[in-house]
């Protein structure tokens, strides 16, 4: 019995070591490549294995205790048998002592039978646990094989996710650089404000000193007038005395004395006046020299121009700052929502049972592979959006410039040539009342991103990047780590576009038939232009990359493509003109005139699905 018990314990330990080694070799490279859901599942399996190991160890310890107890009872039985033999040889017949020994022997036999029965029960339990361990080991090996089968696909998917995360990190760094530039511009504006305040203070001080000196001059003039009045009074009194004196000698004497006194008074007055004038001139020269040394000479016209330029710069910077703050607030809110969704998914996954987690992990692995294929399919559109944002971010530091026209090549198919892009739409930001227009005329101010159809960075682009085309798959940048269930929730399914089939009568009374997918329709066709319209009343739509083609009896007349980022507001329209009216709008087709007869058919395509017709328009009469 003891030999069997220890042998079974050794084999069980070897089995555990083998399982542990298989686990280590099977999951050694998996932990780094699996999602957090796989890590949680693996941890729970490891805990269950450790718990089963501990239970088997306890059972083996109990078995060893029973074996030791059986050995002890066997030794005690031998001792009792020996004593009984001695007593039997020494005494004859049965007595009280013999009955006691018989009772002890019977009790020992019962204990031995109970021990044997317990041993058998433990053997059965060990056999049952061994079957359970084999079943669990089989499930675990199946899971390891399934994970190994998808490991290469996971590596490729992780590389793609790493690239997307790197691009997102690059955009975040560029956003931080723009924020630093905004802070620097604020600091420079504060310095300009301080300099203006200092100059104003100096001007006020000079005006105060001037007023004070003017008061001093008025004081001196009043004192001089008072002295003149007193002197005139004295002279008149002396003249009265002279007239009363009739002696010629006295008159001559007083005349000479009076003339001498007048000369002295005049000399003293002139000396005092010259001294005061010199003091005032010296003081004013000194003040002027001090002002010239402390501040540069300011031209009034130049000062007005610089003040107007500074005000324009401050207004533009404030508008850009408001747009960037609005966009940052919207992105922070989106990140918080995505984080909450991810935490809720992780919490739900952590509550699932072990078998359900294994099944869910397999389903999620399959779903992840499918979703990564979808991400690969959407990679072209995502790269286009990333390039668009890169252009916008690179153009965020463009300074004030004057622009007349902005030529750009528009690729056209069929029998068309090159075109020139001239923006016709005007965007107005409500936060700063600053318009960014691409109309072919002289314009000043801050242009963000060059000629991009008048789209401003900030609230405008922030709304597009989240609620527009990027909202369908832009969240893949946040799929780094976490459970596969979180990946499936963040990479949202693209909702199928709604099909519209309309018949009606236009303003001229002609019947038409229009069909389109989504919210962009061909609204009107005239000999001068083709009009596209966003029929949605609440959502803005990106029409960048859309291509319009016109056919006559099945033959291509011409085509034009919107090859710049263009966001249409709700109920907004954009027109494509013919070659003679290309200066009237931003886009044109290289044709003399558009055909709006019943033989013509106008179609629209998207750049993500260039061969799928998104809309068509025909006249019925």
Curated annotation (Swiss-Prot):
Region (Tail): 401-549
Keyword field: Coiled coil, Cytoplasm, Intermediate filament
Location(s) in or outside the cell: Cytoplasm
Region spans: Coil 1B: 101-238
Family: Belongs to the intermediate filament family.
Protein name: Intermediate filament protein ifc-2
Cellular compartments per GO CC: cytoplasm; intermediate filament; nuclear envelope; nuclear lamina
The organism's place on the tree of life at top rank: Eukaryota
Function: Cytoplasmic intermediate filaments provide mechanical strength to cells.
Organism: Caenorhabditis briggsae
Gene Ontology biological process: heterochromatin formation; nuclear envelope organization; nuclear migration; nuclear pore localization; protein localization to nuclear envelope
Domain annotation IF rod: ranges: 52-400
């Amino acid at each position: 019995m003891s030999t069997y018990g220890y042998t079974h314990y050794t084999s069980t330990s070897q089995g555990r070591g083998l399982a542990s080694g298989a686990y280590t070799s099977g999951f050694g490279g998996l932990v780094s490549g699996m999602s957090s859901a796989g890590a949680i599942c693996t941890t729970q399996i490891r805990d269950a294995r450790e718990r089963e190991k501990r239970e088997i160890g306890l059972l083996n310890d109990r078995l060893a205790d029973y074996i030791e107890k059986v050995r002890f009872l066997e030794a005690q039985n031998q001792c009792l048998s020996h004593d009984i033999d001695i007593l039997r040889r020494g005494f004859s017949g049965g007595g009280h002592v013999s009955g006691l020994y018989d009772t002890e022997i019977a009790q020992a036999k019962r204990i031995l039978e109970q021990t044997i029965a317990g041993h058998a029960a433990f053997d059965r339990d060990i056999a049952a646990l061994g079957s359970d361990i084999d079943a669990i080991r089989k499930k675990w090996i199946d899971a390891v094989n399934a994970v190994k089968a998808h490991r290469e696909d996971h590596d490729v998917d992780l590389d793609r996710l790493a690239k997307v995360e790197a691009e997102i990190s690059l955009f975040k760094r560029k956003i931080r650089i723009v924020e630093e530039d905004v802070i620097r511009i604020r600091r420079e504006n504060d310095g300009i404000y301080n300099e203006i305040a200092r100059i104003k203070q100096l001007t006020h001080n000079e005006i105060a000193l001037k007023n004070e000196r003017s008061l001093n001059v008025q004081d001196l003039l009043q004192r001089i007038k008072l002295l003149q009045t007193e002197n005139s009074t004295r002279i008149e009194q002396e003249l009265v005395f002279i007239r009363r004196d009739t002696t010629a000698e006295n008159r001559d004497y007083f005349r000479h004395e009076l003339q001498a006194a007048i000369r002295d008074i005049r000399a003293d007055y002139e000396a005092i006046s010259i001294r005061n004038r010199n003091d005032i001139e010296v003081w004013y020269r000194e003040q002027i020299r001090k002002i010239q040394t402390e501040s540069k000479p300011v031209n009034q016209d130049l000062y007005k121009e610089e003040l107007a330029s500074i005000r324009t710069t401050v207004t533009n910077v404030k508008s850009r700052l408001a747009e960037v703050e609005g966009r940052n607030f919207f992105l922070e809110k989106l990140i918080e929502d995505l984080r909450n969704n991810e935490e809720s998914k992780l919490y739900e996954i952590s509550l699932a049972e072990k078998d359900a987690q294994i099944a869910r992990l397999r389903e999620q692995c399959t779903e992840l592979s499918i979703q990564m294929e979808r991400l690969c399919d959407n990679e072209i559109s995502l790269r286009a959006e990333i390039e668009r944002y890169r252009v916008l971010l690179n153009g965020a530091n463009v300074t004030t410039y004057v622009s007349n026209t902005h030529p750009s090549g528009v690729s056209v198919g069929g029998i068309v040539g090159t075109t020139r892009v001239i923006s016709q739409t005007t965007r107005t930001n409500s936060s700063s009342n600053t318009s960014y227009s691409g109309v072919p005329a002289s314009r000043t101010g801050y242009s963000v991103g060059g000629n991009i159809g008048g789209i401003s960075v900030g609230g405008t682009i922030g709304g597009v990047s989240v609620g527009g085309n990027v909202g369908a798959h832009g969240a893949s940048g946040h799929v780094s780590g976490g459970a596969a269930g979180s990946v499936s929730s963040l990479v949202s399914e693209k909702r199928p576009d709604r099909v519209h089939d309309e018949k009606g009568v236009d303003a001229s009374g002609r019947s038409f038939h229009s069909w389109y997918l989504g919210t962009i329709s061909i609204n009107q066709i005239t000999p001068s232009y083709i009009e596209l319209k966003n029929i949605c009343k609440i959502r803005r739509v990106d029409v960048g990359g859309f291509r319009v083609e016109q056919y006559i009896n099945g033959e291509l007349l011409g085509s034009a493509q919107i090859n710049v980022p263009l966001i249409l507001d709700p109920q907004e329209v954009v027109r494509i003109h013919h070659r003679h009216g290309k200066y009237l709008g931003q886009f044109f087709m290289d044709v003399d005139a558009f055909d709006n007869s019943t033989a013509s058919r106008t179609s629209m395509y998207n750049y993500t699905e260039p061969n799928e017709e998104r809309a068509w328009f025909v006249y019925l009469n």
